[in-house]
Amino acid sequence: MKTKLFFLSALLLAMQGVCGCGGDDDDKTTFQSRWSGCKNESYDTRSGNQLPWDEECVEYEAKDGGRLYLKHVNALFNCATENVEVITSVNGNHINIVEHAIGNMSANCICPSDVECLLSGLSKGKYSISIYRNMISDAHLQFSFSIDYDESLKGDFRK
């Protein structure tokens, strides 16, 4: 039994390594992602003003080497969320991002948090970006917007 549990655990860890950095035929991958955990306060990084906890936005900025930094500000998750796994796929000029909550989701509350990721392998051009939140088994579209990627790109998208 212990041997089966060990092999199952090893398989799950290997699958997380493969699936956690989604990619496609063009080898565009997320090579960094971060989840802030529940926040007590939220601030607009452009103005420094405090944001209401239910005001979500996506900040984005081009980085050198064909990279794109994305920050989903005030993403709402269950207070019992233990971590958020970011899964990406790039198909042509369409970028899909799934923010997958990990935990038992038993708390009767939600809290704002920030989810960040860094995509690589992009080239100059127009891209559509769709961000989905997956809290249990269903992924729900949160944001869908377009960018014109080049080395000077910097902005945000607000609902």
Model features per residue range: what roles?
Residues Q16-G37:
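Bacterial Sec-dependent N-terminal signal peptides
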Residues P52-W53, G66-M105:
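Contiguous segments within soluble domain cores/interaction surfaces
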